[in-house]
């Protein structure tokens, strides 16, 4: 197994797909996806385009769907939800499909959707992702950060490092044996520096500061937790994520 970390979807190799792709958008799309599925959501379907989301979701009965839209950190007008995982309570999401489009996370998912296996990861479900990698041993693994509008994201790289760090620990292989690129080593180093203060890291991150200005303090606290959910979101068909059975 070789791990590759890419800070943004745009940095992934063109005309290639890995055996397993892991999309990361800690703040907040992949944290929300894990939360919805853990709370009993039927599935999460991701879209880059809001008009396409609306058109597809209209084919579902209103009582079986929820629409979540975020642009620039704020909720899209006319949608039931923005991109806060804390709004995704079991009472609201159980048995329903969440149709979601966000500024960054859905773009990363679209880039890797043709991979043989596509997972979503955040700090909150890191252990489930690591367990899958250790059990299945895919030959090539891309961990793709969503970034922010095409640029580097501190929190996504730290989460990639958290995954790689745990794989190294549990496999007892040296990092250089698992690392397919230098970004893996730097991501592990970043996580190692901040692993005891991930909330502090999120506060330093530019997108974390953006969310603090929007008074999303509790979202940052929630998203900074590690291994609190056992759910593994896995793509069942293009853009549709369900829990692994």
Swiss-Prot record:
It catalyses: (2R)-O-phospho-3-sulfolactate + H2O = (2R)-3-sulfolactate + phosphate. It comes from the Bacteria. It is an enzyme of class 3 (hydrolase). Keywords: Hydrolase, Magnesium. Its cofactor is Mg(2+). GO terms for molecular function: 2-phosphosulfolactate phosphatase activity; magnesium ion binding; sulfopyruvate decarboxylase activity. The keyword Transferase does not apply. Its EC number is 3.1.3.71. Belongs to the ComB family. PANTHER family: 2-PHOSPHOSULFOLACTATE PHOSPHATASE-RELATED (PTHR37311:SF1). This is Probable 2-phosphosulfolactate phosphatase. It comes from Trichormus variabilis (strain ATCC 29413 / PCC 7937) (Anabaena variabilis). The lineage of its organism: Bacteria, Bacillati, Cyanobacteriota, Cyanophyceae, Nostocales. The gene is comB.
């Amino acid at each position: 197994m070789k791990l590759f970390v890419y800070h943004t979807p745009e940095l992934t190799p063109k005309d290639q797909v890995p055996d397993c792709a892991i999309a990361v958008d800690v703040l907040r799309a992949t944290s929300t996806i894990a939360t919805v599925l853990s709370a009993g959501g039927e599935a999460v379907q991701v879209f880059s385009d809001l008009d396409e989301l609306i058109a597809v979701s209209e084919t579902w009965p209103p009582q079986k769907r929820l629409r979540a839209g975020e642009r620039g950190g704020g909720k899209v007008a006319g949608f039931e939800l923005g991109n806060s995982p804390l709004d995704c309570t079991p009472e609201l999401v159980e048995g329903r499909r969440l149709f979601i489009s966000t500024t960054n996370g859905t773009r990363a998912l679209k880039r890797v959707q043709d991979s043989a296996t596509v997972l979503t990861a955040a700090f909150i479900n890191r252990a489930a992702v690591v367990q899958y990698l250790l059990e299945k041993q895919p030959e090539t693994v891309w961990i793709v950060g969503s970034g922010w509008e095409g640029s580097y994201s501190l929190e996504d790289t730290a989460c990639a490092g958290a995954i790689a760090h745990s794989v190294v620990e549990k496999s007892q292989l040296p990092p250089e044996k698992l690392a397919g690129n230098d970004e893996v080593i730097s991501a592990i180093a970043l996580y190692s520096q901040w692993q005891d203060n991930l909330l502090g890291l999120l506060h330093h991150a530019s997108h974390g500061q953006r969310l603090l200005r929007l008074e999303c303090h509790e979202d940052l606290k929630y998203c900074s937790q590690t291994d609190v959910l056992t759910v593994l979101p896995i793509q069942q068909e293009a853009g549709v994520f369900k829990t692994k059975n």
